[in-house]
Amino acid sequence: RPFVTDEAWLHVGGYYTLFGLLTVGLSGMIITGDVFNLYVYLEIMSLSGYGLIALGGRKSMLAAFRYLLIGTIGASLYLLGVGYLYAMTGTLNMADLAARVVPHLNSPLFAIAVACFIIGFGIKMALFPLHGWQPDAYTFAHPGAAAFIAGCMSKAPAYALIRFVYYIFKVDNPVVQSALNVLGILGVAGILIGSIMAMAQYDFRRMLAYSSVAQIGYIAIGLAMGNMYGFIGAVLHAINHAFMKSSLFLVIGGFVCFFVCVCPGFSA
């Protein structure tokens, strides 16, 4: 109730700093052309997200800590994949990687690197069954940042995965095709399980969290197609879902604010 009536959230220490760092991380992921810098910006975004979630209260701290532990595993796998690519090619520049990785497309190291990227980004983007952090994170996130986090936190890793699959890796390679097939299967499972779990929830934000698991499944299926139509579909759905999910969180916040102000006995 203090959040919607007294605007106490505006005075929470570190809120604007964390929000600014989150924006910096997202912007850096877009403009960078280096896979290690991408890791740095991804972690700036993630650490800021952990902090914004933790500002929401006691339950938020537990949700943020759980997200931190799981997210660190995803980041470590991504960094391990970067290490394998560097060992094979001797460069971290994306344009150079795309050219130098070609002779190694059938090597075991490349297969391990692809697996690390798929699992690492899968954790970060809450792909089923690696979505365990998302329901609590969305439900207990700081109300002043929940809409932004819901719209961007899982889409940014999806964007990074798109850059790897379509720009650095070759989608016609058997190793990459096998990884994309697994990604597609997980996407279908995520759509089914996420939708069923969303319909079973009584908390609006938790329902939207499981709905996001299903929507990430659609993006994964677009990626798994490995062609231009799948690429266009994945990008359009990622943009659409970012705006749609943020808007739904804002709508829910508006309803809660209205009922708290109009109905004194209403509990948010």
Stretches with model-predicted labels:
Residues R1-D6, T23-F36, S48-A268:
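Hydrophobic transmembrane alpha-helices and their helix-loop junctions in integral membrane proteins
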Residues L18-L21:
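Mid-membrane cores of alpha-helical transmembrane segments in multi-pass membrane proteins
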Residues E43:
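Short phosphate-coordinating micro-motif centered on Lys-Gly-acidic
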